[in-house]
Amino acid sequence: GSLIGTSHGIFVSSDGYAVSRWKPFVGASKAVVVDAQGKKYDVDALISANDIYDVCKFHVAGNTPTAPVASNTIPEKSTLWLSCYSVRAPRLLRSTVSKVESFSVTGSGESGTSYPFYILDIQVPEDIDCCPLIDDAGNAVALIQPVSGKTGTANAVSVKFVSDMQSVMLGQGANTLALSAIPPLMPSDYNDAQIALVLAGQQRSPEYYASVVESFIRSFPQKTDGYETRARLRLASGDVAGADADMTKAIA
């Protein structure tokens, strides 16, 4: 496949959870993260996404470096440092918080808690969307949003808002995740996962449905549902041998 988008982000845990911009994931069937040292990680699951603020939470395979996430709101007139990523020449740019607004989002994967949204005095370079703003203690405070032209100001959404997102496969949140063919994180409860599997079949994208089926099989390899569903998909596409292999697993 071809590259459809790039962005920045940060790891928010040592076990592979990360936050970034949502737009590059839309229409993607695969994503790879490259950290500041040049190490690559495959994205193996989407957790949640918010298309209003254009952010998402996802998971990569393997252990990861992590940035501490600020739990408090940074007051106006404070200094924040924009960490501009580059494997060759990373740099920090100074910014001043000119205004702090608050927002809350109640819905699938989101708690309804109030979070800060920052307006900053800073001349932002190009191609730094979703780079983190950090405080003097090194905590990740916010993710910078894309800027058009040289305005001298920029907006940034709370890292904690994105980090707090929970796994979602039902409701509007599921519809948003269905815009990507990267598999969502399957619910740990088998009954919930069965519901998610059925609902995924009603989504518009067959690629998304196929990715959900694969995620279900990985999460519940001893259950027959996933193999039976994949067998039907393979048979519909003319893969008789593959369908037969799946049905053999299902009845074993």
Q: What function would you assign to each model-found segment?
A:
Residues 228-229:
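Alpha-solenoid helical repeat scaffolds
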Residues 13-92, 117-123:
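Conserved active-site neighborhood of the chymotrypsin/trypsin-like protease fold
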Residues 142-208:
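C-terminal cap/linker of serine protease catalytic domains
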